[in-house]
C-alpha cells in the first residue's frame, strides 16, 4: 500500500469551510453528544412542523429500529426548490449536458419549480398520492430529476430502476414495490446508441399481473417510433399541456419513505433499500456541503446516473437542498472522444468533479494527451466514489487531471448508508493515495475480527459502524427481518458493512474490498484490491481484476485478468514480468497463479466490475453465469471464456 502523504495545501485550507482543528472539534461533538449535534444540524432543512425528538435508534438483536427527527414534518421538494425561489429563483439549478456535445440546457430554480409542479399534477391526475410507489425507468434527462421531485412533492415514493436493467429485472422491481404507475422515455441515448426503454417497459409489464400497472407515462427523448397502449400509455408532453404549473407540497413525517432503491444482495435477490425523508435529506445536504467544500456559486458535477444511490444523493437531493448548480450528464466518458469529461468541465466551468475509479482507469489507458489538450482551470475539488481507488489511479487523477492543485475526496459509502461515511475533507485532511481516510461527523467505524472481537489501533478486519447516523437506511421494503439478518446479525449491536478494511497507525481507513472479495491463499487472507493495485501500478497495465479459484495445493489460487494500455501486446514474457512485479511488490503469497490478458472486463452500465462472472470463468464453470442483463458489453464475456487460462473442468 502507498505510504505517500499529501499535506493540505494553503490554498485548500484558506478557502475551506472546515480546517483540521474544526474537524476534530465537530467530530468529537458529534460522537459524544449526537442528540445535541444533530439537533442543531437538523435545522439546515426547513420543517413545517419542527422536530422535538432527535434520535431514537436501536441496533439490538430483534429490535432494530432507526428513527431520526421523528415528530417533525417536512417536504423534500420544498427544501430542494421552493425555499430557494426568493433568493435564487433565476440561478441555474440543473445544467443538462446531452449525449451529443451540441445539446445542453440550463434550468433555473424557477423553471425547475414549474416543471416539477407540472409533473406532480400529471401524477396526481392519475391517482398518485402519499405513500404510492412510482417506478422510474429513465435516461439521464432533466425529466428524471423532475419525476423524483414530483413524487417527493406529493409524498409518493419513487423507485428508480437504472435504464440498463433488462425487462426481467425491471418487472421484478415493479412487482416488488407494487407500482401502479411507470415513468419512462421512448428511448435513451448513450454513446451515440439508442436504448429501447419503452420497449423494455412493455416487455416487463407482460411478465406482471394484468391489473398491476395502470399507467405508463412516456417522455419523448428521441422521437423514436414506439408502441403506445391506448388507455394505459400517454406521452408526457401531451399530459403536461392539460395541467397547471402550481402544485401544493404535501408535508410528510420525517420517517415517511422518500424512495426505494434496489441493490444486489449476496443471495442474488435484490433488496429494496428504504430511505426516509428528514434524516436522509439532512445527511445528504450536509455531506454534500462539507465533503465537497461546496460554496455558493460553485458548479458541481457528479458523473453518476440517477439510477444509482450516488445519483439520488449527490446529483439531485444533496446539491439542490443546498441551492447548488448541479450538472446532469447523459453521455459516457469516451464519446465522442476520450476528452469528453474534460471538455464538459471547460464548457461549463465545473469547480467540483465527482466520478468513479473505473472511469479514471479506463481514461488512463488512453494516456495524458486527451486530458492535457483541455484547460480544467476551473476545477477546485476532485472526488472518487463506487469502489476503492488504487494509488496509481489516484496519482494520475491528482497529477494529470487536477494538475496537483486539487484535493481528492476518496469517499466510502453504500446504497444502505444514504450518504458518505468515510472521507477526507478538502481543507482538513492530509491525503494518502488509496485511503478513504477518516469518518464523517457522527460516524463511528469499528474494526472487528471474524469472531466479532473489536480491534484497537492499527489492524485489519471487518468494517462495522457503531451507532446510527441520520442517512442510514431504515428497512428492506416489505422484509424487516431480512434487514436485521443482513446487517445486524453478524456482529451484535453493530451495523456490518460487508466490507473489509485496514486501519493504519494514523487511524486512516483503507477499504480492502467486499469481504467476499478476499482470497484465502494457503491460509493467508489476501484482499483482491491489493493485488489489483499492484498490477495497475505496472506502466503497461490499464486495469486489472483479481479473483480466487480452487487450487489443489493452496486451497485458493489467484487468477488475474489484466487489460493493457493501448498499443501494448500481451505476450508470455509480459505475463511472467507481471507475476514477478506483484511478487516483488507484495510478496510471493500474492503472485498470480494464472494471468489472462483481457481486452475488456465485464462491467455493469454503472461501471462496476461483475466479479461474479470473473469468478465463474476463473473456476472454468461458465455454464451458469446467472443474470447478465446488466452487462454493458456482453461480447467481453465471450472473449474471456475463449481465452481462459484454467481448463481444469
From Swiss-Prot:
GO cellular component assignments: cytosol
Pfam (any one): AMP-binding_C
Cofactor: Mg(2+)
Catalytic reactions on record: acetate + ATP + CoA = acetyl-CoA + AMP + diphosphate
EC class (word): ligase
Stated role: Catalyzes the conversion of acetate into acetyl-CoA (AcCoA), an essential intermediate at the junction of anabolic and catabolic pathways. AcsA undergoes a two-step reaction. In the first half reaction, AcsA combines acetate with ATP to form acetyl-adenylate (AcAMP) intermediate. In the second half reaction, it can then transfer the acetyl group from AcAMP to the sulfhydryl group of CoA, forming the product AcCoA.
Protein's recorded name: Acetyl-coenzyme A synthetase
Amino acid at each position: 500500500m502507498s505510504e505517500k502523504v499529501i499535506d493540505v495545501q494553503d490554498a485548500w485550507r484558506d478557502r475551506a469551510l472546515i480546517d483540521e482543528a474544526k474537524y476534530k472539534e465537530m467530530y468529537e461533538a458529534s460522537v459524544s453528544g449526537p442528540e445535541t449535534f444533530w439537533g442543531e444540524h437538523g435545522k439546515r432543512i426547513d420543517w413545517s412542523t419542527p422536530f422535538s425528538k432527535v434520535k431514537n435508534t436501536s441496533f439490538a438483536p430483534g429490535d432494530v429500529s432507526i428513527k431520526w427527527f421523528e415528530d417533525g414534518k417536512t417536504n423534500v421538494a420544498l427544501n430542494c426548490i421552493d425555499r430557494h425561489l426568493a433568493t435564487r429563483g433565476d440561478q441555474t439549478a440543473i445544467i443538462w449536458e446531452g449525449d451529443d456535445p451540441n445539446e445542453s440546457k440550463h434550468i433555473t430554480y424557477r423553471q425547475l419549480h414549474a416543471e416539477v409542479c407540472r409533473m406532480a399534477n400529471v401524477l396526481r391526475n392519475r391517482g398518485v398520492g402519499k405513500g404510492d410507489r412510482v417506478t422510474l425507468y429513465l435516461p439521464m434527462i432533466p425529466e428524471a430529476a423532475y419525476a423524483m421531485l414530483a413524487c417527493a412533492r406529493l409524498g409518493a415514493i419513487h423507485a428508480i430502476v437504472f435504464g440498463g436493467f433488462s425487462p426481467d429485472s425491471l418487472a421484478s422491481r415493479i412487482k416488488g414495490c407494487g407500482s401502479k404507475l411507470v415513468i419512462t422515455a421512448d428511448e435513451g441515448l448513450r454513446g451515440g446508441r439508442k436504448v429501447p426503454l419503452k420497449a423494455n417497459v412493455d416487455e416487463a409489464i407482460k411478465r406482471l399481473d394484468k391489473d398491476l400497472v395502470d399507467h405508463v407515462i412516456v417522455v419523448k427523448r428521441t422521437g423514436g417510433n414506439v408502441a403506445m397502449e391506448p388507455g394505459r400509455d400517454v406521452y408526457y408532453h401531451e399530459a403536461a399541456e392539460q395541467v397547471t404549473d402550481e402544485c401544493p407540497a404535501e408535508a410528510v413525517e420525517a420517517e415517511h419513505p422518500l424512495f426505494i432503491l434496489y441493490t444486489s444482495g449476496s443471495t442474488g435477490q435484490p433488496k429494496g433499500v428504504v430511505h426516509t425523508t428528514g434524516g436522509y435529506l439532512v445527511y445528504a445536504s450536509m455531506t454534500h456541503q462539507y465533503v465537497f467544500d461546496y460554496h455558493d456559486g460553485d458548479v458541481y458535477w457528479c458523473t453518476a446516473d440517477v439510477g444509482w444511490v450516488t445519483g439520488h444523493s449527490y446529483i439531485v437531493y444533496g446539491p439542490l437542498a443546498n441551492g447548488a448548480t448541479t450538472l446532469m450528464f447523459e453521455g459516457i466518458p469516451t464519446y465522442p472522444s476520450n476528452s469528453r469529461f474534460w471538455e464538459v468541465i471547460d464548457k461549463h466551468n465545473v469547480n467540483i468533479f465527482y466520478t468513479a475509479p473505473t472511469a479514471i482507469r479506463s481514461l488512463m489507458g488512453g494516456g495524458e494527451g486527451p486530458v492535457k489538450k483541455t484547460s480544467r482551470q476551473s476545477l477546485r475539488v476532485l472526488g472518487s466514489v463506487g469502489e476503492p481507488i488504487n494509488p496509481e489511479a489516484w496519482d494520475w487523477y491528482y497529477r494529470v487531471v487536477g494538475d496537483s492543485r486539487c484535493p481528492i475526496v476518496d469517499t466510502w459509502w453504500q446504497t444502505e448508508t444514504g450518504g458518505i461515511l468515510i472521507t477526507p475533507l478538502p481543507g482538513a485532511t492530509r491525503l494518502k493515495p488509496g485511503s478513504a481516510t477518516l469518518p464523517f461527523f457522527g460516524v463511528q467505524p469499528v474494526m472487528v475480527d471474524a469472531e466479532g472481537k473489536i480491534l484497537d489501533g492499527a489492524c485489519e478486519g471487518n468494517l462495522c459502524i457503531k451507532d446510527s447516523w441520520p442517512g442510514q437506511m431504515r428497512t428492506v421494503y416489505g422484509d424487516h427481518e431480512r434487514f436485521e439478518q443482513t446487517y445486524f446479525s453478524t456482529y451484535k449491536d453493530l451495523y456490518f458493512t460487508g466490507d473489509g478494511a485496514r486501519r493504519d497507525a494514523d487511524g486512516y481507513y483503507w477499504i480492502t474490498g467486499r469481504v467476499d472479495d478476499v482470497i484465502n491463499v494457503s491460509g493467508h487472507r489476501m484482499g483482491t484490491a491489493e493485488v489489483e493495485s499492484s498490477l495497475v501500478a505496472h506502466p503497461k497495465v490499464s486495469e486489472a481484476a483479481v479473483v480466487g479459484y480452487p487450487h489443489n495445493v493452496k486451497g485458493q489460487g489467484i487468477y488475474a485478468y489484466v487489460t493493457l494500455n493501448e498499443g501494448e501486446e500481451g505476450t508470455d514474457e509480459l505475463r511472467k514480468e507481471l507475476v514477478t512485479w506483484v511478487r516483488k511488490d507484495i510478496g510471493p503469497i500474492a503472485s498470480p497463479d494464472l494471468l489472462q490478458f483481457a481486452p475488456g472486463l465485464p462491467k455493469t452500465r454503472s461501471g462496476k466490475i461483475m466479479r461474479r462472472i470473473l469468478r465463474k470463468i476463473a473456476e472454468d464453470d461458465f455454464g451458469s453465469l446467472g443474470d447478465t442483463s446488466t452487462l454493458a458489453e456482453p461480447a467481453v464475456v465471450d472473449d474471456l471464456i475463449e481465452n481462459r487460462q484454467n481448463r481444469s473442468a
